[in-house]
């Protein structure tokens, strides 16, 4: 379902940062200021968000992987929830340097996590001493927190969706280095450079974060559904062709 201007207003997408912290590169997306707070021009944000959703829809229809990134306190739960709903990987605890540029190392950690989870399933914990079990549980909890959201990501993602480019500068830099497209929410205090699909908007409000994440997840699910429908239609068409020529 398409996001409306009213929904953006209600979520506070238009509230930027204090004027003294602004980044001049965001000037084209700023409407003005009120009480020393920059106001983002939603007439720019809405079509740009629609463009980002269109791109995500196409990517998902082609079975692409979009990595959700949002590690700030107010976005963690939403990022995990919406990524899981869309069947996509996510990082919501801390971006570990090299998560994309040094994927080989990440794969080693993912294997370790999966092996440990398999050991738990097999009841291996019961065979351990109390101390061994405690250390094991601590390690698995740490791994689940840091890489649990990417354990099923088979390789470098086809795109990343980031909430707050300043806070996740390393993630954006790694994506740029590898030529991975970046879809990102950029507030008035950051630069839109290095972002392929800029969504000018508030990156602190939990309501605004929910609006972006839900919109991206919805676009992924729509893209996948469209792809399935096309396959069904093609199969139906083939069946009709066979019947006609039978």
Curated annotation (Swiss-Prot):
* Entry keyword annotation includes Membrane: no
What is the top-level taxon of the source organism? Bacteria
Its Gene Ontology biological processes? translation
Tell me the CDD domains matching this sequence. Answer: RPS2
Q: Which UniProt keywords apply?
A: Ribonucleoprotein, Ribosomal protein
Molecular function (GO) terms for this protein are: structural constituent of ribosome
Looking up PROSITE patterns in the UniProt record yields: RIBOSOMAL_S2_1
InterPro entries assigned to the protein according to its UniProt record, in alphabetical order: Ribosomal_uS2, Ribosomal_uS2_bac/mit/plastid, Ribosomal_uS2_CS, Ribosomal_uS2_flav_dom_sf
One GO cellular component assignment for this chain's record is: cytosolic small ribosomal subunit
The answer to keyword S-adenosyl-L-methionine applying to this record is no
Q: Name one Pfam family in it.
A: Ribosomal_S2
Q: Which family does it belong to?
A: Belongs to the universal ribosomal protein uS2 family.
Q: Which HAMAP family match?
A: Ribosomal_uS2_B (MF_00291_B)
What name goes with this protein? Small ribosomal subunit protein uS2
Q: What is the organism of origin for this protein?
A: Burkholderia thailandensis (strain ATCC 700388 / DSM 13276 / CCUG 48851 / CIP 106301 / E264)
């Amino acid at each position: 379902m398409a996001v409306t201007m009213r929904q953006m207003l209600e979520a506070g997408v238009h509230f930027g940062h204090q004027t003294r912290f602004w980044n001049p590169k965001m000037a084209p997306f700023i409407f003005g200021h009120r009480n020393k707070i920059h106001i983002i021009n939603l007439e720019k944000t809405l079509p740009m968000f629609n463009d980002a959703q269109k791109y995500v829809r196409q990517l998902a229809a082609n079975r692409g992987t979009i990595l959700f990134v949002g590690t700030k306190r107010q976005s963690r739960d939403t990022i995990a929830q919406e990524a899981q709903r869309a069947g996509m990987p996510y990082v919501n605890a801390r971006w570990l340097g090299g998560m994309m540029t040094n994927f080989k190392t990440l794969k080693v950690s993912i294997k370790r996590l999966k092996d440990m989870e398999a050991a738990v399933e097999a009841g291996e914990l019961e065979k351990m001493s109390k101390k061994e079990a405690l250390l094991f549980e601590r390690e698995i909890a740490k791994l689940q927190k840091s890489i649990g959201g990417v354990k099923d990501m088979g390789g470098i993602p086809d795109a990343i969706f980031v909430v707050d480019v300043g806070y996740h500068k390393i993630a954006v830099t790694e994506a740029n280095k590898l030529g991975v497209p970046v879809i990102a929410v950029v507030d008035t205090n950051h630069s839109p450079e290095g972002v392929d699909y800029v969504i000018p908007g508030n990156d602190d409000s939990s309501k605004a974060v929910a609006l972006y994440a839900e919109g991206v997840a919805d676009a992924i699910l729509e893209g996948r559904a469209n792809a399935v429908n096309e396959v069904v239609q093609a199969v139906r068409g083939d069946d009709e062709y066979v019947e006609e020529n039978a």
